[in-house]
């Protein structure tokens, strides 16, 4: 099965990255940083939870007059201190989506942005223990866990831009994984920061995530529609840096993901059994290097 080959590549990556030279921080031993090979002003921060599927990336993009931090991870350890050691520019945070492994450290920052459709989900998750999504495969003390906060989060929409000085970051709304799921295009490098939408691990469009607001956007069909809508723009990107798995993926992943959504919509019952993570639904579709794990009630 092709998806098993791809997940073996992911497991190999998870082992290899632990051996690579990285910037480490006394103030937060949970995070390692790597400079992008094309642009040292893009810094990738890696939180290794000991589980190759759950380890998460945050991305710091630095311009001449400002910086943008994409996601804040699980909220374990002092992330603000890490960012302060990497840039002296004023920092804004943009959450690619509301899930707890991407928003856990938000309370450490003042200027936080999120797509308007995900803000209600994020607010609801603050009062739900399961919404915190703390890793279960990593040893850490409760003292290291950053308290959540309902401080004001600014709403964004498709096409909004962040001007950092010498580079512009453009928001691309890409629903499916969440109602307000987004990606970000960097004008200087052509890198697409693809969040949990397009990555080297499976994209999840499953009923394990709530569908209270804008339920029609938590579907494979909505994902496909957004890919088609933005394909002219996405075809111009050069590389993909997702929130999980390998970085600097070829832009072929974009068209492969569109084809994967097409195949699911044509024949939703044509799937393979996915047993990599027992707690997840077992239906997976794989087209080239693109993978989607889905449930039948999230097709349309």
Protein language model features and the residues they cover:
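Active-site HxH/HxHxD metal-binding segment of metal-dependent hydrolases
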Residues: 5-6, 74-163, 200, 253-268
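Conserved beta-strand hairpin/beta-sheet module of binuclear metal-dependent hydrolase folds
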Residues: 29-85, 184-200
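Short beta-turn/strand-loop junction motif enriched in small, turn-promoting residues
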Residues: 48-50, 99, 169
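Accessory terminal helices/loops
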Residues: 1-29, 225-300
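Metallo-beta-lactamase
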Residues: 18-40, 67-69, 75, 111-175, 178, 188, ...
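Flexible, glycine-rich phosphate/dinucleotide-binding loops
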Residues: 51, 121, 249
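Residues at the C-termini of beta-strands that transition into short coil/loop
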Residues: 46-48, 97, 116, 244
